[in-house]
């Protein structure tokens, strides 16, 4: 009976010692949070393991995550996966549908990234356009008009300059045949008669003013169809056109004239652009929006993935994943880290404590046997 009591007593003592030892060991992982000193000597095991090695742990966790978990290869594979493609494409489609549904304008879109497009156009647009036009004038002012125009436009004008004769003569004939033309001829005759006095009075003895006006009108109309008159008009137009093409830009417009045109044009362009910026994009560019919804989402998703893949290494270096994780862990309160680890490994820590009690009890059992037989 005495021997049984000794064994039980040793088992209980061993279990208590083993269990409490493990509990203390687990607590010493976290506590104390700061070192303690007796006089100038630091108390051993202060601070606890995790507070003491906190920076090293943070560095190691960051290294492990960067080198073995969130690696460049793994992220690249995920980016190129079908799920990523579908997710990015779906997001683009949602934004495009919102663009159509909400009737968003360019101004509303740019305002979402804190850009006032109207203000930008007014403050920078005028100056930029005028500056570009003036730079163009300075660079090309000695060149001929023909050399400045696109070759296709010059070719088109060369081929159709003769058509100007038909157009001009047709317009002149229509004007002369109209009531306005008749009235203008009569008005000019009245002025002419008033200025010439007696000479015209003698002429009116043979013809009335109306007959004279009618005769002049008929002759002018006939001239618009006369081959010689048309040849003269064609020659004049061709010569003027050729002179215009061969004229340097600075002879057609001097610097002050061009500057005035540039300023007026820049104001017109920016004002027009500001008005257009307030119109819904779907109204302003319906075909472009259809293209965006139909084809661009897939192409844009591929482009985004491709560019991310190409620049992933640079991005990861800029992000500095290891440093970011290390910084974040070092900002955590030690209480929070303790709570986090206990929540994650609560079951395992309890098993460790239980194992301490069990091993302590087993050791106590053998110590009891030794105490009895020795």
Swiss-Prot record:
One Pfam family this sequence matches: DUF445
UniProt keywords, alphabetically: Cell membrane, Membrane, Transmembrane, Transmembrane helix
InterPro entries: DUF445, UCP032178
Gene Ontology, cellular component aspect: plasma membrane
Lineage: Bacteria, Bacillati, Bacillota, Bacilli, Bacillales
Record membrane topology: Multi-pass membrane protein
Transmembrane residue ranges: 4-24, 354-374
UniProt family annotation: Belongs to the UPF0754 family.
Transmembrane keyword on record: yes
Protein name: UPF0754 membrane protein SAB1779c
Localization annotation: Cell membrane
């Amino acid at each position: 009976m005495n021997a049984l009591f000794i064994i039980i007593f040793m088992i209980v003592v061993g279990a208590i010692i083993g269990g409490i030892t493990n509990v203390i060991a687990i607590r010493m992982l976290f506590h104390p949070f700061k070192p303690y000193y007796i006089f100038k000597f630091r108390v051993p095991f202060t601070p606890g393991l995790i507070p003491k090695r906190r920076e090293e742990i943070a560095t190691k966790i960051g290294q492990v995550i960067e080198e073995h978990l969130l690696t460049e290869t793994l992220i690249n594979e995920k980016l190129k996966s079908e799920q990523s493609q579908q997710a990015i494409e779906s997001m683009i489609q949602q934004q495009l549908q919102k663009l159509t549904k909400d009737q968003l304008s360019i101004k509303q879109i740019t305002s979402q990234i804190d850009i006032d497009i109207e203000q930008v156009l007014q403050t920078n647009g005028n100056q930029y356009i005028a500056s570009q036009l003036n730079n163009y004038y300075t660079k090309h002012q000695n060149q001929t008009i023909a050399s400045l125009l696109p070759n296709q436009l010059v070719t088109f004008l060369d081929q159709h300059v003769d058509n100007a004769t038909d157009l001009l003569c047709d317009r002149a004939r229509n004007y002369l045949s109209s009531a306005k033309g008749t009235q203008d001829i009569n008005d000019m005759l009245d002025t002419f008669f008033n200025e010439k006095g007696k000479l015209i009075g003698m002429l009116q003895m043979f013809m009335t003013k109306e007959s004279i006006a009618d005769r002049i009108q008929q002759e002018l109309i006939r001239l618009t169809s006369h081959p010689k008159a048309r040849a003269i008009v064609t020659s004049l137009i061709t010569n003027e056109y050729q002179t215009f093409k061969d004229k340097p830009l600075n002879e057609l417009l001097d610097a002050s004239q061009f500057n005035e045109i540039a300023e007026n044009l820049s104001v017109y362009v920016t004002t027009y652009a500001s008005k257009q910026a307030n119109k819904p994009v779907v109204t302003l560019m319906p075909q472009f929006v259809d293209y965006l919804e139909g084809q661009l989402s897939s192409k844009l998703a591929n482009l985004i993935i491709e560019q991310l893949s190409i620049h992933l290494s640079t991005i990861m270096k800029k992000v500095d994943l290891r440093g970011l994780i290390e910084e974040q862990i070092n900002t955590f309160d030690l209480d929070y880290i303790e709570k986090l680890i206990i929540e994650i490994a609560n079951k395992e820590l309890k098993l460790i404590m239980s194992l301490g009690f069990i091993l302590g009890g087993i050791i106590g059992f053998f110590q009891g046997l030794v105490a009895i037989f020795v």
